[in-house]
Amino acid sequence: MNDTSGRADALAAQYRTDGYCVDRQALTSAEVTALVDEATRLCREEAARLVGGDVAGDNADDLGRFLAIHFPHKLSPLMLATLAHPRIVDVLTRAIGPNVKSMQSMLFIKNAGKPGQAWHQDEDFIPTRDRSLGAAWIALDDATVDNGCLWVIPGSHRPGVLWPLRQHENPEYDFAPESFDFPYSDADAIPVEVPAGSIVFFHGHLLHKSLRNRRTTGFRRALVNHYMSAESLLPWWRDGGAIAPTHDLRDIVMVAGTDPYAYKGIVDLNRPYVRAESARTTPA
């Protein structure tokens, strides 16, 4: 067994046990720089064309107006290629299975002072038939407690329960609903502080959140991609009628293995859009 295989095996084992794992500095500094440059370009050049987007200006401060851009892989060949980054595929093919597809990407900007997101489970928003949903959260900046890193409750994926959701009025978090009535407390949570270039993998049933970026300057940027087994159907729809309910949404990108439903073809329905602080959301 080579070092690469051994690392990926260990990460996948932790993913199954704890519901998350961290591949520290999986991307090179050059890869991180390229993604940061591309994120800046998307905010400045593409925002005017995004559904619900504003026009970004030329100053760095203008980038801070955006919480996130959804589906950036449809705007950027680099972010499309990153869906199938070898370090991601190495772990997911061990944690999920040999055939893996992606249905969503999100570019989080999270400027200084911007809120976090309350406890939630991603599979509440993107349902699979086999509990295979997983995320690859790529840190484009060092993620710390101060600037709003992820927090997770290790092992909270194991019951396989999707806990109820409710609206909240906690100013620490954005408008997205929060999970509640689960048998864990904040004392069970741990921060996931990682250097730029690290990938945090987490299960779709894992309870996770992030807090406000409490720094006075600077971003906590992250590119977050969602994946699932290619064998599972994707009965997904998005709030507000953006995507109607469907038996199996085929707006996907295969990143590993073979597609057992290739005969259905591929569609292009989801449109990139800017996520504002006061709009409704799909998760991440």
Regions found by a protein language model. Give the residues of each.
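Short, solvent-exposed loop/turn segments at secondary-structure junctions
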Residues: 28-29, 107-110, 143, 157-158, ...
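Non-heme Fe(II)-dependent double-stranded beta-helix
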Residues: 1-18, 24-119, 125-128, 165, ...
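Active-site region of the double-stranded beta-helix
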Residues: 98, 123-128, 139-149, 156-157
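Non-heme Fe(II)/2-oxoglutarate
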Residues: 45, 53-57, 206-284
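Histidine-centered active-site/metal-ligand motif
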Residues: 70-73, 120, 157, 202-203, ...
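A short beta-loop-beta micro-motif enriched in histidine and acidic residues
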Residues: 121-133, 187-188, 194, 218-219
